[in-house]
Amino acid sequence: MTRFIFDLDGTVTKEETLPLIAKHFSVEEEIMELTRNTVYGRVPFIESFIRRVYVLGKLPVSEIADLLGKVRLYESLCNFINTHPENCCVATGNLADWVCQVNDVVRCEFFCSEGNIENNQVKKLTSILRKENVVNRYKAEGHKVVFIGDGNNDV
């Protein structure tokens, strides 16, 4: 079976989610620079992600989830995914608690980073998704894998 693995930011969504969160909460300057350097391969994804979550983790998780629940999506792609959920999944470094409302609309399996949430804030990252692990999992199961993404960390 062919498995289509989609990056979330800029692939399923029409905009990058971390800069959207940062702008909404007025912490965009630092996040924009980290995101830009990550997309262009200047800062390793893991290092950048930890730094971005440190900044954004102080913000209310429920408000971030509500904000991302309203993010603009590529409708045709979402229709494809929702028509073929058994062949599709989304792999994103975003925290599962942040993208849960997107997963309500894009109805396939989501692979996300995880964190401990206390008092509606991220207290600690517990796992950071490595997208290549999702690819390797499906290859090991004998699937043909097609990964669709737009950033350096999607290669």
Q: Where do the PLM segments sit?
A:
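Short, charged, surface-exposed secondary-structure boundary motifs
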Residues: I117-L125
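Short secondary-structure boundary/capping elements
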Residues: R72-L73, T126-R130
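Intrinsically disordered, low-complexity regions enriched in small/polar residues
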Residues: F6, C112-S113, A140, G149
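Conserved Lys-Pro-Asp/Glu-containing loop-to-beta segment of HAD-superfamily phosphomonoesterases
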Residues: L129-V155
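Alpha-helical substrate-recognition element adjacent to the catalytic core
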Residues: T2-C112, E118
